[in-house]
Amino acid sequence: MGCGAGGSCTPRPPIRQQQAPETRVVAVVFLGLLLDLLAFTLLLPLLPGLLESHGRAHDPLYGSWQRGVDWFAAAIGMPAEKRYNSVLFGGLIGSVFSLLQFLSAPLTGALSDCLGRRPGMLLSLAGVATSYAVWAASKSFAAFLASRVIGGISKGNVSLCTAIVADLGSPSARSKGMAVIGVAFSLGFTLGPTLGAFLPSETVPWLALLFAVSDLLFIWCFLPETLPPEKRAPSVTLGFRAAADLLSPLALLRFSAVARGPDPPTGVRLGSLRGLGLVYFLYLFLFSGLEFTLSFLVHQRFRFSRVEQGKMFFFIGLTMATIQGAYARRIRPGREIAAVKQAILLLIPASLFVGWGHTLPILGLGLLLYSWAAAVVVPCLSSVVAGYGSPGQKGTVMGTLRSLGALARAVGPVVAASAYWLAGARVCYTVCAALFLLPFSILRTLSPPARTLKAE
C-alpha cells in the first residue's frame, strides 16, 4: 500500500513473478544440453571395440543380434569384412535408439505442457543418468542394450530443450536459442568422441554417469520454469491422448496431436506446420543416411583408419560449430526459411562431390558444404516451428518435431545402407542429391506463410 501527498493510501498492484530472463534461460539450456551430449558421445569411438569384445565373450544375446546383422548384410550384398560389420551393427543399435525416441518424445512433450518444463526435464535426466548407471555397473551385452533402451526412452530432454526455447517471448530470442542448441550439438559431437577415444574403455561409462548426474544437479539448481501455470494444458490425460496420435507416422506428419489440442493453429498455418514437418522428416531421412554411409565410403575408397575417420568427423563438427556461432545464430527472424533453402541446395553438390570424388580435396569440399547445411537446417526449421501453437502446446509441437526427426534417423540409415551396397556409392549419393529437391520444392510453396510466423 502506498500513501500520496494528501495522506490517502491506495493499494499497490500485486507483485507478479517475473519471467526468467531469456539470456539466462538460453545459457542454462546450452550448458545442460552440452553436458548431456558429452555423456552420450563418449561412447561413439568405443562402440566397435565394445561390440567386438562382446563377440569374443560369446555372449548369447549378442550372438542372436549378430546373426540378424549377418542376414541383413548378406541380403544387401555387403562385403563380409569385420569393419563394415561393426559399422552396420552399431548403426542398427542407433536405429533402435532413435525408434525409442520417436515413441517417447511426444509423450514427454505432452507431460511438460501440463506439469511444466522443469519436472519433465528432471524426470528425463534422471532416466538418462539411470541408463549410464546400468551400463557402468555391468559388462554384459544385455546390460549395455538395456542401458540403450532406458536412454532412448528418457531422451525427451532434447525436445524439452527446444520447447523451453519455444516458450521465449520474442522471435529473435527463439531464433538465437535454436542456433545455440545447434552449437551445443556441434561441440558435443566434436569434443565427446575425441575425449572418449583417449580414455580407457572401463572409465568411459563412469565419466558418462558423472556428466549425467552433474547435468541433473545443474538443471535442478539453475533452470527456471518457463511455462507458467496459467498457460499450461488443462489435463495431462488429454495431452497423453493427443500424444498417442504420434505413434502413427501418418498422424505424426499431420501434427494430429497439435490440431486436436486447445487453441490449435488452423487453416493456412496448420498446413504450413505440416509442410515444415514433412521437410524436416525428408531432410533428416536423407541426411542421416548419407551420414551413416560416409564411414563405409571413406574406408572403401580412401582406406581411412579409425583415427583418420575421427579426424574427419572432428573437422565436420568444428566447421558446424564455427558456422553456427558466426552465421546461423545471426539469421534474422523471418529469414530462416530462405537460409534453409540455400543450405539444402548446397547438399546437392555436396552429395555429388562426396559420392563421385576420388581425391581428398574434392572430398573435403563436399564435407565443407555438408557441414554448412548441417549447421543451418535443423536450428532454423526448429526456430520457425517454435512459432506455432499456443503456449500450452509448445512441448507437444516440439516433441512432434523431435519425434519426426527420430523416426527419420531410425529408418534413414537402414535404407541408405541398403542402397549403398546394392547399387553402389555413386548411385546412392546421386539419388540422394536429386531427392533433396523434394524438401526444397515444399519450402518454396511454404515460404510466404512461414516468413510471417509469430507466436500465437
From Swiss-Prot:
Membrane topology qualifier: Multi-pass membrane protein
Subcellular localization: Nucleus inner membrane; Cell membrane
SUPFAM superfamilies referenced in this protein's UniProt entry, alphabetically: MFS general substrate transporter (SSF103473)
Pfam families associated with the record: MFS_1
Bilayer-spanning residue ranges: 25-45, 87-107, 125-145, 149-169, 179-199, 204-224, 278-298, 311-328, 343-363, 365-385, 422-442
Presence of keyword tRNA-binding: no
GO biological process, one term: apoptotic process
Keywords: Apoptosis, Cell membrane, Membrane, Nucleus, Transmembrane, Transmembrane helix, Transport
InterPro entries: MFS, MFS_dom, MFS_trans_sf, Sugar_transporter_CS
GO CC, alphabetical: brush border membrane; nuclear inner membrane
The UniProt record lists the keyword DNA-binding: no
Entry superkingdom: Eukaryota
Molecular functions per Gene Ontology: transmembrane transporter activity
Role played: Probable organic anion transporter which may serve as a transporter for some non-steroidal anti-inflammatory drugs (NSAIDs) as well as other organic anions across the luminal membranes of renal proximal tubules at the final excretion step into the urine.
Family note: Belongs to the major facilitator superfamily.
Protein name: Major facilitator superfamily domain-containing protein 10
